[in-house]
Amino acid sequence: MKKKLFIKYFTPVLLSGLLLVSVIGCTDKLDEPFENESFTSDVDYTIAEDMVLPLMGAYYGFYTRQWEEPLTLGIRGDDVNAAGDQVPMQEQDNFTYMASHWNTNSVWQNHYNDIVNIFTAIDEINKYREASGNNALADQYIAECKVMRAYLYLNIARTFGGCIVIDALDNIQNTPLSNKEQVMQYIVSEMTDAIPNLPDVHPNKRIDIPGGMTTYTAYAIQALAYQEMEDYQGVVSATSQIINSGEFQLSEDYYHLFKVAGKLDDENIMEFQYSDFNQGEGDRFGFLFAPFGIGGWTPVVTGAGAGWGFYEPTMKYIEFMLDRGESVRLETSVIFTPDGITELQNDYGTLPEWIDNTNREGDIFNNNARLNFASGKHIQPSTELIPGRTSLGSNKNFIVIRYAEMLLMYAEAVTRGASAGSMSADDAVNMVRARAGLTNLSGVTTQDVLDEKFAELAMEWGTRYYDMIRTESVSELSHEGKTFTMDKAYLPFPADQVAELPQLEEGIQ
């Protein structure tokens, strides 16, 4: 059902040369995150039911990600190669950094655009508070905004080694730079404040905003911050809240978790939601998955869009999985071309019979000059396209945080000496392994968990890279001709941002 909403554009804020404008969307349906709306300059803060509109605007901005973001965050791990013709990404993959690289500037700028948008949304929600007569609901909406903002800060700090934690929009240029530890402490504190005000359910059980932020999204982000701080008891505390809630379970079908069937799955703690609105033409809200795809494929559905070939699983990862006897996770994570199969046979030897250049659905992946392998977690089978749609990944959500990651984070923390909660490290790891069809482990070590995370979470949002930085695993990141040193752990602040924000020039203290 379409609604016509009349709300204002938020006041533009100048940050690093970009005018920031918040655009508000609204939804009524599970599978329709946002619909087209009309805008005017009039706002009536006495209309209590409109208090949700600024929150919807925050979600709209949060879900509107740029294609280069997940690639930039992911390409430096030993699970991914930067393929294609994007020279800055190829240089970053080889740990050659330049402050002038366009994609790192984009990641910084777009994250801060959303942070400023969220600040504005919080301010707007508070303007409706009195008319709403519902302080608890206003507090919930603000808590949801804080969770989104915390995730954005988490990304920036892990990528650049620190960032500016904004305290007021009119004081950005005077706000001192925070190092990564300080940012993580801020995130932990923000989530502690937000958690009591959030819905205490799985995101897919929310009726008002299906898939929206909940208590457990906040706990997951808090756990990630604790992990970056190497506060492993904090990791156990936060992940235990998720584990003990009974709200989450591993999907029985790892392969289809990353397809349309995985939308709002019980395993997903946070995901960016997209939709074709169940129609073959007209409005759609989506992410541009083309950079993950392979050009020149032969899809089952004639005319289905191909891809650009910018994101390639590494030979190291594939051979690691073959050594473990992995099947479903390797099939899900890696798409093979004929040249890739030949390269593997020459380097590794005999391959399992199931390895082929055709997926389960019948799409054929032909040779491509840009890459020999592609990330299956990001390539939607053509048969899942709504008739009339042709864009790669159209109608596909983008999973950000999964229950499997929380289980493995919990297990690692216990192996590092944290007091266990309701389950052992063995139990947590073996839950994930059982889904993959692997045998149980006993006496799990930290290395066992890191290996399991490598197998389970490869190609997902730079998780492997962040683990290797946290553990200072220099030798792991030095692979396939690449040489890593810890002074390359973080990207430099973008030159365009340093020019606008003088505190960045001083660097991380």
Tell me what each language-model feature is.
Residues 336-430:
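C-terminal substrate/ligand-recognition segments
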Residues 3, 16, 20-49, 187, ...:
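Bacterial Sec-dependent N-terminal signal peptides
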